[in-house]
Amino acid sequence: MKCPFCSHPETQVVETRVAEDGDFVRRRRQCGACDKRFTTYERPEVSFPNVVKKDGRRIEYDRSKLIGSFSIALRKRPVSTTQIDSAIERIEEKLLNLGQREVLSSRIGELVMRELKKLDKVAYIRFASVYRNFEDIDEFRALVDEVRK
């Protein structure tokens, strides 16, 4: 692997560890030219289903969109990045287990809402109010009442 510091084409693996959950491998590498060390992560490459939008367009699955949705909903909420990553991984696992080539964006939205509801009720309400496109206060109030139960 090329060194990110000096671009030397060869580096040596000096340490390898499997993550606690076994999902990826962490490697410490050292450059033979500049002697600097850096870390790489290896995880299996998987093929997610394409996402079918409301208007019928088909786009590639994009993890960063999930991260963005969680970040907005959880802004200034007491939820760690580890918890967010775990929630996203659960969603991705469900998408892969569907075994389908396409998934509706609404299905992904429902999975996000389910995970947010477990993580933080306020974030769940924030996301749901935008996702479900509430048009009046009564819809909002009904959701809050549902969460309180």
From Swiss-Prot:
HAMAP family: NrdR. Coiled coil: none annotated. GO terms for biological process: negative regulation of DNA-templated transcription. Negatively regulates transcription of bacterial ribonucleotide reductase nrd genes and operons by binding to NrdR-boxes. It comes from Paracidovorax citrulli (strain AAC00-1) (Acidovorax citrulli). Binds 1 zinc ion. Residues 49-139 form the ATP-cone domain. One of its GO terms (molecular function) is zinc ion binding. Pfam families: ATP-cone, Zn_ribbon_NrdR. Its cofactor is Zn(2+). PROSITE patterns: ATP_CONE. Keywords: ATP-binding, DNA-binding, Metal-binding, Nucleotide-binding, Repressor, Transcription, Transcription regulation, Zinc, Zinc-finger. This is Transcriptional repressor NrdR.
